[in-house]
Amino acid sequence: MARSLKKNPFVANHLLKKIDKLNRKAEKEIIRTWSRGSTIIPTMIGHTIAIHNGKEHLPIYITDHMVGHKLGEFASTFNFRGHTKSDNKSRRR
């Protein structure tokens, strides 16, 4: 279900403070975050945010096409390697 338009998009406070600080200094550095549920807002464009996928932080460069999406959409949490040849459980009978 989509978030109500009466509410603002969710962005973690600590992440918002770091973005604002970097925008004021006009610096570019990688921001590490565990907040996968934060929405990408226009002030994040041009920054590189390292998003935690459960094992490591994946650096993602934020572009204008990503605005409105969640950070977690760009860092997959699992790595599917395919079914094995002898795996009869997953085969269709």
Swiss-Prot record:
Q: Which PROSITE patterns match?
A: RIBOSOMAL_S19
Q: Which Pfam families match?
A: Ribosomal_S19 (PF00203)
Subcellular location per the Swiss-Prot or TrEMBL entry? Plastid, Chloroplast
Q: Which BP terms does GO give this entry?
A: ribosomal small subunit assembly; translation
Gene Ontology CC annotations of this record: chloroplast; mitochondrial small ribosomal subunit
**Disulfide pattern:** none
Question: In terms of one coarse class, where is the protein primarily found?
Answer: plastid
Q: Which InterPro entries match?
A: Ribosomal_uS19 (IPR002222), Ribosomal_uS19_bac-type (IPR005732), Ribosomal_uS19_CS (IPR020934), Ribosomal_uS19_SF (IPR023575)
A GO molecular function held by the record: structural constituent of ribosome
Provide the alphabetized UniProt keywords.
Chloroplast, Plastid, Ribonucleoprotein, Ribosomal protein, RNA-binding, rRNA-binding
Primary role: Protein S19 forms a complex with S13 that binds strongly to the 16S ribosomal RNA.
Q: Which family does it belong to?
A: Belongs to the universal ribosomal protein uS19 family.
Name the UniProt record assigns to this protein: Small ribosomal subunit protein uS19c
Organism of origin: Ipomoea purpurea
Q: What is the lineage of its organism?
A: Eukaryota, Viridiplantae, Streptophyta, Embryophyta, Tracheophyta
Q: Which gene carries the instructions for this protein?
A: rps19
